[in-house]
Amino acid sequence: MRKLVYYVGVSIDGYIAGPGGEFDFFPMEDTLAWIIDEYPETVPSHVRAQMGLEAPNRRFDTVVMGRGTYQPALDAGVTSPYAHLRQYVVSASIPEIGDPQVELVRSDPIGLVRRLKQEEGGDIWLCGGGTLAGALLPEIDELIVKSYPVVAGDGISAFTGAFRPTPFTPARSRSLGSGTTVTWYDRA
């Protein structure tokens, strides 16, 4: 069965972005090279084109994201940010998505993920944001957390929602040169 994997970067204090959705404060020097090597499919299509990156998908063939994660692409004029993946945007507030490569899901993200898990294919990447991650917490099978050596102080939390302690077990960890640590967690 396919897994739902929340692959996310966080500050020391647990934020995935600043209050305005900004994430340019995360140090990316050696992290980008690692991402390209390990999870090239998580690089947006328009960035892949600029870099000349033609690497095949290694783990994920589907991405699920909330409106806050999708909106920066729209603001940049990109309607299909991950054209090399099956794309689902979960939002009750977007009136429509004018791109046939992106499916708008207005409700029941848990039902969506359960259906996707039953299909053949690679794993499902939960791209964010924190509200969607909080809603999908019961379905998350694995966390891949890039912990950046920076304190944000405020912003968008990795998980937003009800108090619901959910145990995960560390499976492995890797330190990158910039002080960023990547830790893989399996649902306990």
Task: Name these PLM-found stretches.
Residues 1-188:
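Enzymes that bind and transform nitrogen-containing heteroaromatic metabolites
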